[in-house]
């Protein structure tokens, strides 16, 4: 290597390259790691040095050289690259490796307008000194490379135009804790700040993108998911689109319920004009969703819901596919088709499904969610009423069209609206669940708005986080984590701003939370269980029982302290009904684990003191934040031992946790023979989870004769999911052979899923 090369320092001075210094930094970064070679990294980077190279470019070249060596055989390069990246990041943020004192850092950031000035109003310099003593900056060294790149790209406070970075990860964690507990009494709050900081900085609790990137800054909107219901009037349609724009601009993912909009050709003003139908209004919503790019943190994305029996359903099911012309396609949203038992019964009996415009059949649309018996009574009555416009379709043809579109696009989702209302924390008579969200894990009541400031409408918000099952040794640890997660997210509801009155009203009235899990695949591998063979059924029952029990207990304790949520009377919990009372009894045939906790005592305490939060759990996808915690995604099996994620910061390689010890224990996605085992596990989880689950179906065409997945198989899995009480189905993944080769040159590529990464964590 040429020792006479000149390098340009960060301050503009030039000097000769100091290879010893580079070697020392690499030695430091490699300390304690297995199977990594410093000289290999040096060789790969030296050939890219040139005369006049900036020291920052040298650093980036070395980081990239180390990251390129991450493989199944040498997973520790992900930590070598991460340490080098942390070193570089701190130099950029602080001009040196050692972070400054927390108080001085906060003062400077508030002056620059990067942090919310309430931090200095809420806490004294003395309290900041105490918080500084809680910080363990060495925890930065436990990040994987993919995690550091996620932090840099999405989470750390920065100037997205110039690329300047202003903080390091431990400051992010301590300040999120400080903001969330700022309204707690002085005598207890620092204790909560420390406990919460420890839980998030050791990856036991995983936080969603809006909280990680937003709490501590002047922007105060952190709900990942927003659910907006549209009425059947122009005013309501315009109010819906205004609400979409407001929330898309503030980092949220959108669920739109457009099922009430009348069908093409319906009379308007008593026949003075006829209606243009759903598609022009769906296009209007699509434009609203795509209007904001959210400052590089995420692009806008939405899932739009409609009932299977809508008169226009055959035109709506094909909106996402690549055939057709611009005029009859709306491709940049995803769609959720709403189904209930009557539709499935017609399919099984070889019957017809009758399609109506919701505007022609009084009471039918509301009964579809609120009362299944009443829905069936009205539906059959309207089928026999010759004065009502309708169309009959063979059930098998309609279901086949839906499943064909689901298979070809992967993004036609399913919502079983009867399960969403019969196994629900809400009383469907007063608070029916009429839609889900972008990623299908949220099930909350909504009401249409007539204008954007309508006080009587209700926009549902959900605030998410997750427990990292890979970071706990026993289920008992969930008790403390549940206390911290519930208290932090509940405090967030009061801390954040609400751009629309209907959203504030619902959030303050219901105080809904959605706490889920990440790293489930690692949890199974650690316990020697598999997805596909039933061996994980009892463990899953035990795990999710503990999660829901401790979450309810934490919310009940909080209610004793701060009062139940104002609309607690609209929940089934208020009547003493718990998820263990309303689950689908078909599950008893596939799991024989008994209940382990004192639900009876909890039931009495909830009836007496209430809950601070109407909902507590939801199982969301977690591609992004599971990278920060070096965990597997949500409840999903990994596609490969090494996954490659294409992000705007380049290609990121991530190796499954504890690969060297557990490589034979993991069950990879495409090793599963079918969806049965996975759908059983989702059903068992849904027994306890009070909202819903982003559950996927997966197909490998090469397993079937003629290399094509038979329609019969798709319908069988749909019915299996329904049988086990599954509320929603999210993606359908089809193996194309390219994405999951297991050699190190072609590890599995993970796409960003819902384009925005909202509603996931």
Task: Label each PLM-derived region with a short phrase.
Residues 1-3, 36-174, 178, 191-197:
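Core nucleic-acid recognition elements
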Residues 13-17, 164-167, 187-191, 211-217, ...:
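Alpha-helix capping and helix-loop boundary segments enriched in small/acidic/polar residues
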Residues 44-45, 63-65, 79-87, 199, ...:
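A glycine-rich phosphate-binding loop feature that marks nucleotide/adenosyl-phosphate handling sites
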Residues 77-113, 149, 339-341, 420-451, ...:
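Terminal amphipathic helices with adjacent charged low-complexity linkers/tails
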Residues 124-151, 440-446, 489, 493-494, ...:
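Catalytic alpha/beta core of large soluble enzyme barrels
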Residues 157, 164, 171-189, 193, ...:
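Function-dense linear segments that define catalytic or interfacial modules
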Residues 199, 482-504, 508, 529-622, ...:
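Internal maturation/activation junctions in enzymes
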Residues 318, 327, 331-409, 417:
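Polar, glycine-rich mid-to-C-terminal structural blocks
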């Amino acid at each position: 290597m040429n020792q006479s090369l000149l390098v340009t320092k960060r301050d503009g001075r030039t000097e000769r390259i100091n290879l010893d210094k580079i070697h020392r930094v690499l030695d430091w970064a490699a300390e304690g790691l297995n199977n990594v070679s410093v000289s290999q990294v040096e060789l790969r980077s030296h050939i890219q040095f040139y005369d006049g190279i900036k020291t920052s470019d040298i650093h980036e070249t070395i980081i990239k050289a180390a990251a390129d060596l991450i493989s199944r055989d040498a997973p520790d390069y992900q930590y070598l690259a991460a340490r080098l990246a942390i070193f570089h990041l701190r130099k950029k943020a602080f001009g040196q490796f050692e972070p400054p004192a927390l108080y001085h850092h906060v003062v400077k950031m508030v002056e620059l307008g990067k942090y919310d000035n309430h931090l200095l109003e809420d806490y004294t310099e003395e309290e900041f000194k105490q918080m500084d003593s809680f910080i363990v900056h060495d925890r930065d060294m436990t990040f994987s490379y993919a995690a550091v790149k996620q932090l840099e790209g999405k989470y750390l406070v920065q100037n997205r135009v110039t690329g300047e970075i202003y903080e390091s990860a431990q400051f992010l964690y301590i300040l999120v804790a400080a903001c969330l507990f700022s309204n707690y009494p002085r005598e207890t709050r620092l204790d909560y700040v420390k406990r919460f900081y420890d839980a998030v900085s050791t990856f036991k609790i995983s936080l969603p993108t809006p909280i990680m990137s937003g709490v501590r800054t002047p922007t105060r909107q952190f709900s990942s998911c927003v659910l907006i219901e549209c009425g059947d009037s122009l005013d309501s349609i315009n109010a819906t689109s205004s609400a979409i724009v407001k929330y898309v601009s503030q980092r949220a993912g959108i669920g739109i319920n457009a099922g009430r909009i009348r069908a093409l050709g319906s009379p308007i003003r008593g026949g003075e004009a006829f209606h243009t139908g759903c598609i022009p209004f769906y296009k209007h919503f699509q434009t609203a969703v795509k209007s904001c790019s959210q400052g590089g943190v995420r692009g806008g994305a939405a899932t739009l819901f409609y009932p299977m029996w809508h008169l226009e359903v055959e035109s709506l099911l094909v909106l996402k596919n690549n055939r057709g012309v611009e005029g009859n396609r709306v491709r940049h949203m995803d769609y959720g088709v709403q189904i209930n038992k009557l539709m499935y019964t017609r399919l099984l009996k070889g019957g017809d499904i009758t399609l109506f415009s919701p505007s022609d059949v009084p009471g039918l649309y509301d009964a579809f969610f609120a009362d299944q018996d009443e829905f069936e009574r009205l539906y059959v009555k309207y089928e026999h009423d010759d004065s009502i416009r309708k169309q009959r379709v063979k059930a098998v043809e309609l279901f086949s069209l839906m499943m064909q579109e689901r298979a070809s696009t992967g993004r036609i989702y399913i919502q079983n609206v009867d399960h969403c209302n019969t196994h629900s924390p809400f009383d469907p008579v007063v608070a029916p669940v009429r839609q889900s969200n972008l990623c299908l894990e949220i099930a909350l009541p909504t009401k249409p708005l007539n204008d954007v400031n309508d006080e009587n409408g209700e926009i549902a918000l959900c605030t998410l986080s997750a427990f990292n099952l890979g970071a706990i040794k026993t289920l008992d640890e969930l008790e403390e984590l549940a206390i911290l997660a519930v208290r932090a997210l509940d405090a967030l509801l009061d801390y954040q701003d609400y751009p629309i009155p209907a959203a504030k009203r619902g959030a303050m009235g219901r105080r809904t939370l959605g706490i889920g899990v990440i790293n489930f695949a690692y949890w199974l591998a650690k316990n020697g269980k598999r997805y596909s063979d039933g061996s994980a059924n009892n463990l899953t029952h035990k795990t999710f029982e503990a999660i829901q029990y401790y979450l309810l207990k934490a919310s009940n304790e909080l209610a004793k302290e701060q009062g139940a949520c104002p609309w607690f009377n609209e929940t089934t919990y208020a009547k003493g009904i718990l998820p263990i009372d309303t689950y689908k009894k078909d599950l008893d045939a596939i799991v024989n684990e008994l209940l382990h906790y004192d639900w009876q005592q909890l039931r009495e305490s909830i009836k007496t003191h209430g809950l601070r939060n109407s909902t507590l759990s939801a199982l969301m996808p977690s591609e992004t934040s599971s990278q920060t915690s070096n965990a597997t995604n949500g409840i999903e099996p990994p596609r490969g031992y090494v996954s490659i994620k294409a992000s705007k910061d380049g290609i990121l390689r991530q190796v499954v946790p504890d690969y060297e010890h557990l490589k034979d224990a993991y069950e990879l996605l495409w090793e599963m023979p079918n969806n049965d085992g996975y759908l059983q596990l989702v059903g068992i989880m849904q027994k306890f989870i009070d909202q819903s689950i982003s559950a996927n179906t997966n197909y490998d065409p090469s397993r079937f004769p003629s290399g094509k997945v038979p329609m019969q198989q798709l319908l069988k899995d749909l019915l299996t999911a329904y049988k086990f009480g599954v509320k929603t189905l999210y993606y359908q993944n089809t193996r194309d052979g390219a994405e999951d080769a297991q050699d190190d040159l072609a590890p599995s590529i993970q796409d960003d899923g819902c384009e925005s990464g909202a509603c996931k964590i």
